[in-house]
Amino acid sequence: MSYTGRYVPTNPKKYKGNPTTIYYRSLWERKFMVYCDKNPRILEWGSEEIIIPYLLPTDGKVHRYFPDFYIKVKRSDNKIRKMIIEVKPEKYTKPPKKPKRETKSFIKDVYEWGRNQAKWKHAREYCRDRNMDFLILTEKHLMPQYKSVSYTHLRAHET
């Protein structure tokens, strides 16, 4: 089941973009929005506000990638770091396992894997050119054991 909705920030001045048009496409995205909105170390954040062009190898055309999040973080050493964050279920961060029979579902998964790899390659280049970091966060980072929020992967970049 997919959970989508509109997010209303409690700190709209921190939001880079129009704070009245923030939408989440999963509860993980919403959880990360709350984290960005309420965390004092997050100085600025945006959701799908950056556009990164990427070449999709399957059709040879340039497409537009809207990463889930942009954040500007004040690290514990008081240095500022900018990051682009993609929130994905862990199963989509690994190549699909080939079944005994090639199904339509498997073919679709292979296509999506290829598309994601192209997007993430261009996102890494985009970030490298701008002295930023690119991170992919999964449910293991956002909801370990489904008990509480743990952003240890993100905190590693805050120090």
Task: Walk through the language-model features, giving the residues of each.
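Interdomain/boundary linker segments immediately adjacent to catalytic/signaling cores
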Residues: M1-S26, L154
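Active-site metal-binding core of divalent-cation-utilizing nuclease and nuclease-like domains
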Residues: T21-Y24, G46-M83
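Nucleic-acid-binding surface
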Residues: Y23-K38, L43-E44, E48
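Short, well-structured alpha-helical interface segments that form or flank functional binding sites
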Residues: L27, K31, R64-Y65, I80, ...
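Short, solvent-exposed polar/charged micro-motifs at secondary-structure junctions
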Residues: Y54-D59, P144-S150
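Acidic active-site catalytic centers that drive phospho-/nucleotidyl reactions
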Residues: D68, E86, E158
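Catalytic cores of nucleic-acid endonucleases
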Residues: V87-K147
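Conserved small/polar residues in nucleotide/adenosyl-binding loops
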Residues: T152-T159
